[in-house]
């Protein structure tokens, strides 16, 4: 428990001054990525704790049936996280759950699953499907290790692949330096996606994985 709380607090101070000041943080946000391992959960946990530390009532959600990430969400946000599963649930049930649990929240943060468009049958059941169904703006977490301006076409593709989705910005993970981030910020500008901040390389900010997902503190 202490280890995880340390991670939440550390991440919340590393990268959020930009994103916390944007209009997108006033209500709803979905955290997506190009692939698993980009840092969605690390970023989401820090964001939940940062919002909580600002005395905001934050409601976390998780795309898919994952029961491990939701337990981390609860520790970071101070309230139970809710699964939104496009495979097991009807669209009506997902909408009802989302409306019910966001009714008393200042901010709702939904963590995606795998890559943004990855579902059980093409995009069916994907984070993108949940975003489109609930009209939630998307922030992409991008693994910037060993890349710089090459993220521009990636961001452009994610922003334009489905016109009904609203990709509002990107946060970069594993950033080596301010100079590195300047290339990434330029890539965002040229791709038409707002750069919202970054997580620097930091060995302390890592939650080990196991076969069913991220490790829990009691493991």
Model segments located where?
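Hydrophobic alpha-helical signal peptides and transmembrane signal-/tail-anchor segments
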Residues: 1-14
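Internal gly/pro-rich beta-alpha loop/helix module
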Residues: 149-219
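Short hydrophobic alpha-helical runs that function as membrane-insertion/retention elements
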Residues: 138-141, 196-198
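Short, Lys/Arg-enriched N-terminal segments with co-localized hydrophobic residues
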Residues: 13-24
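ATP-dependent carboxylate-amine ligase catalytic core
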Residues: 22-38, 42, 48-134, 142-169, ...
């Amino acid at each position: 428990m202490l280890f995880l709380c340390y991670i939440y607090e550390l991440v919340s101070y590393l990268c959020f001054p930009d994103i916390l000041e944007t209009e997108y943080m006033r209500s709803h946000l979905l955290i997506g990525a190009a692939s698993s391992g980009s840092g969605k959960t690390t970023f989401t946990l820090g964001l939940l704790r940062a919002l909580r530390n600002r005395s905001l009532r934050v409601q976390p959600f998780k795309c898919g049936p994952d029961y491990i990430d939701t337990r981390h969400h609860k520790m970071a946000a101070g309230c139970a996280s809710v699964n939104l599963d496009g495979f097991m649930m009807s669209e009506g049930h997902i909408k009802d759950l989302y409306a019910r649990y966001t009714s008393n929240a200042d901010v709702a943060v939904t963590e995606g699953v795998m890559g943004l468009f990855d579902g059980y049958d093409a995009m069916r059941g994907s984070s993108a499907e949940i975003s489109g169904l609930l009209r939630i703006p998307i922030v992409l977490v991008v693994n910037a290790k060993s890349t710089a301006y090459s993220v521009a076409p990636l961001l452009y593709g994610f922003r334009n692949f489905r016109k009904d989705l609203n990709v509002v910005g990107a946060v970069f993970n594993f950033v080596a330096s301010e100079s590195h981030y300047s290339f990434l910020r330029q890539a965002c500008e040229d791709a038409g996606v707002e750069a919202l901040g970054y997580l620097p390389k930091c060995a302390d900010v890592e939650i080990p994985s196991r076969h069913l997902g991220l490790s829990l503190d009691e493991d």
